[in-house]
């Protein structure tokens, strides 16, 4: 369970390094699509540089954020799985948590700002999450979500201040290096 001021989702300070990213890649590999890397034909003319595009829009939820969400979900203890997970998001992270938690039978509650675009809200619900609309912005929704996770003793999956999430998202870098050494 996340405690305020921690960054690895387990209540400890850690560090993201190549080893943790490689471990994440091994952990999530069976459930994440290795997206293609395409050389842009137009952008080099505008930037005077070679530009490659990593097509993460082809992931199940349409964004790279699910890599980190899945990595964190796969590191949950049995007790954390039973308690369910809580996250705060304005869209992509929440969809990743919702999809991968639901796929594994883990209850997911996603807190989103009241003014979240309908397409993000609808997709998060469609992936199986209980969505709570709260606050005027992400920070307000996140603070309330953390408070609820502490009350319920549920794991909080932070979208960016969690080393396990960051390592999962970092797996995109390993793919980039493999695809374009």
Regions found by a protein language model. Give the residues of each.
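PLP-dependent amino-acid enzyme catalytic core
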Residues: 5, 10-181
């Amino acid at each position: 369970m996340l405690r305020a001021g921690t960054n690895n989702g387990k209540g400890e300070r850690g560090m993201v390094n190549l080893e943790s990213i490689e471990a994440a890649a091994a952990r999530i590999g069976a459930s994440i699509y290795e997206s293609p890397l395409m050389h842009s034909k137009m952008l080099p003319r505008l930037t005077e540089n070679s530009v490659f595009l990593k097509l993460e829009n082809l992931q199940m939820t349409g964004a790279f954020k699910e890599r980190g969400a899945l990595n964190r979900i796969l590191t949950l203890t049995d007790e954390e799985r039973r308690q369910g997970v809580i996250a705060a998001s304005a869209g992509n992270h929440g969809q990743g948590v919702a999809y991968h938690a639901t796929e594994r039978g883990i209850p997911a509650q996603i807190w989103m700002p009241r003014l979240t675009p309908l397409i993000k809200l609808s997709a998060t619900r469609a992936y199986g999450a209980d969505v709570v609309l709260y606050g005027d912005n992400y920070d307000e929704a996140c603070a309330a979500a953390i408070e609820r996770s502490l009350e319920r003793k549920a794991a909080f999956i932070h979208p960016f201040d969690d080393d396990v999430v960051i390592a999962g998202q970092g797996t995109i870098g390993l793919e980039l290096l493999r695809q374009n050494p």
